[in-house]
Amino acid sequence: MNKDLLLSSYDYTLANELIANYPTNPKEDARLLVFDRKNKEIFHTTFKNLQDFLPNCAIFFNDTKVIKARIYGNKASGGKIELFLHQPFLNSHNPLFLAQIKGRIKKDEILYFKEDLKVRVVELLNDGLRKVQFFQNDKTLDTSNLYNLLDKIGHIPLPPYIKREDEKSDLKDYQSIFAKNLGAVAAPTASLHFSETMLENLRKKHEIYHLTLHVGAGTFKSVECENIQEHKMHSEFFNIPQQACEIIDSKQAILGVGTTVTRTIEYYTRTKTKNGFCDLFLHPQNPPIRQNHLLTNFHLPKSTLIMLVSAFIGREQCLKLYELAIKEKYRFYSYGDAMLIL
């Protein structure tokens, strides 16, 4: 079988010390590895120098906003419960949500949280997932009211590889400066490096566009099939404004900030759908056909994200750059350093 289709071909070893548990401060001082595909040149710099390397291009950001999706409560028996909200079921008649719950629970069980919030377990699904309904003062909560309540009692859902509890600083650090549309349970992390000053300087030379893709918990789901083509990609809600669609439809060069932007642009390019659910899986055998440049962080081994990067530059080249980044002590994952692919 083609090695590009083998899960084991996307593996690498990373020392725990290179997993960033906190962002660089100030954030634009994070390191940046620049790879020029045309000339096969590599540059090591800092993120604040990003503009020095950018060609003439439109820049696309994901303006999704992370909700405080993790809450702690109790069962009627007093046993402790941790609930991680994934997403609403948008087509259900009653407001129902998909959630992951730690602890043994039964169908129709009621769980209790702060602010008189109650959760009824409607259905037990696979992989620890549950279909649930939220109540406050015996009234069913819709998405908007639930998100408002979670803002009071919830916790920022840090990724599983950050081995600490969320802190006050994460409220700001794990949210991009242009985040506005609530619905993500993970941050589009390439966006986290940008400061207001950097963004203002970018606007002087580049047109900036926003789209929304609500990053789901599926972004952390590991690929388990040795033939990656058998992997079932998670689905995430997206919306692209008309003005952004017109740029995608043009011949203007595009820099996508983050893998979520890339998947949204490429899904639209293939389907001409401006609003819906994206389940596009990009890898070397299904490469991008529209986006020209990519800004992204360093991703987990065997993840769909490292496969997406490989779709841009080839699997072997991707692994070589990761090997170099490890040698040069770059910081990895959500709070880590960045890579610019030209």
Curated annotation (Swiss-Prot):
InterPro entries: QueA (IPR003699), QueA_dom1 (IPR042118), QueA_dom2 (IPR042119), QueA_sf (IPR036100). Its main location: cytoplasm. Keywords: Cytoplasm, Queuosine biosynthesis, S-adenosyl-L-methionine, Transferase. Coiled coil: none annotated. It comes from the Bacteria. GO terms for cellular component: cytoplasm. It is found in: Cytoplasm. Pfam families: Queuosine_synth. Pathway: tRNA modification; tRNA-queuosine biosynthesis. It catalyses: 7-aminomethyl-7-carbaguanosine(34) in tRNA + S-adenosyl-L-methionine = epoxyqueuosine(34) in tRNA + adenine + L-methionine + 2 H(+). Belongs to the QueA family. Transfers and isomerizes the ribose moiety from AdoMet to the 7-aminomethyl group of 7-deazaguanine (preQ1-tRNA) to give epoxyqueuosine (oQ-tRNA). This is S-adenosylmethionine:tRNA ribosyltransferase-isomerase.
